[in-house]
């Protein structure tokens, strides 16, 4: 199991938190998602054999937020 923290821009409310947690949490291989709205960070625990950091970032960007590269 790996853990990664992504810097995410554009989140401003609890709806944003729920959207990111749901979209990332539905990915196969993701075991935990925690969004820190104030810091603009998303902590993800995942199985790198099943899902990549790019897949996780894409899921966040699909919700309309920007992931720092």
UniProtKB/Swiss-Prot annotation:
Chief localization: cytoplasm
Positions of the HMA domain: 2-68
Pfam families xref list: HMA
Entry's localization field: Cytoplasm
This protein's UniProt keywords: Chaperone, Copper, Cytoplasm, Metal-binding
Annotated Cu cation binding sites: 13, 16
One GO location term (cellular component): cytoplasm
Parts forming coiled coils: none
Induction: By Cu(2+).
GO molecular function: copper ion binding
Single GO biological process annotation from the record: copper ion transport
InterPro entries in UniProt: CopZ (IPR049740), Cu-bd (IPR000428), Heavy-metal-associated_CS (IPR017969), HMA_Cu_ion-bd (IPR006122), HMA_dom (IPR006121), HMA_dom_sf (IPR036163)
Gene3D superfamilies in UniProt: 3.30.70.100
Origin: domain of life: Bacteria
Subunit structure, as described in the record: Monomer in the absence of copper. Homodimer in the presence of copper ions. Forms a heterodimer (electrostatic interactions) with CopA during the transfer of Cu(+).
General function of this protein: Chaperone that serves for the intracellular sequestration and transport of Cu(+). Delivers Cu(+) to the copper-transporting ATPase CopA. Functions in E.coli to transfer Cu(+) to CopA missing its first metal-binding domain.
PANTHER family reported for this sequence: P-TYPE CATION-TRANSPORTING ATPASE
Note, other: The copZA operon is activated by CueR and indirectly repressed by YfmP. Cu(+) ion is always at least three-coordinated. Physiological thiol may be needed to complete the Cu(+) coordination sphere in order to prevent homodimer (dead-end products) formation between 2 CopZ.
Protein name according to UniProt: Copper chaperone CopZ
Organism: Bacillus subtilis (strain 168)
